[in-house]
Amino acid sequence: MKIIKLDENNIPDIARIEHECFVHPWSEQSIMNAIRAGHTFFGCEKDSVLYGFAGVNIVCGECYVDNVAVSEKYRGSGIGKALMTELISYCKMKNADFVTLEVRCSNKSAIALYESLGFECTGIRPKFYSSPTEDAKIFKLITNK
C-alpha cells in the first residue's frame, strides 16, 4: 500500500469511503468544493483501490483535519496512522503552527491513534455530533517546535 495525494479524479472513491464510514457523509459536490477551495486530501491505495483517506485545510498557519476514514475491513492495519503521519508531515512542510481535529468521545480507537501521534485533548464540544448526539473531543498537535 502507498500514500498518495488525491485530486478531483478520486472524488468517487472518497465519497464511497465517506458513505461506508459516516452517518452524515460528505457528498461528491462537497468533496469537490473542498478540493477546489484548497483542502488537501491524502489516500492509501493498493492496485488502484482506495482504502482510506485524510483531508486537511490550512488557514493562516493552522491545520484543521476535515476527515479521516478507513474502510471498515482495513481498520487496525496501520492505514489511519500512515495517513495521519503523512498529513502531519505535510502540515509541517507548510510551516503550520498546529494541527487540530474533533473526534467522537466514543471513538476510542481514533483517540488512541491521535494520542500515539502526540495530539493532546484541549477541550470538549458539547453535542457536536448527531445521529447519535454526542460530544466531540478537540485534539491539537503543536507542529512548530
Q: What spans do the regions from the language model cover?
A:
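Acetyl-CoA-dependent GNAT
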Residues: K2-K73, M84-E86, Y90, K94, ...
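Conserved hydrophobic beta-strand within the GNAT/NAT acetyltransferase core sheet
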Residues: V65, V99-V103
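Active-site acidic-Proline motif in GNAT/NAT acetyltransferases
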Residues: S71-S77, C105-S106
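Short glycine/proline-centered loop/turn elements that form peptide/ligand docking sites
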Residues: M84, N107-A110, K127-P132
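Conserved catalytic-core motifs of GNAT/GCN5-like acyltransferases
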Residues: E102, E115, E120-D135
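Terminal substrate-recognition subdomain of acyl/acetyltransferases
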Residues: D135-K145
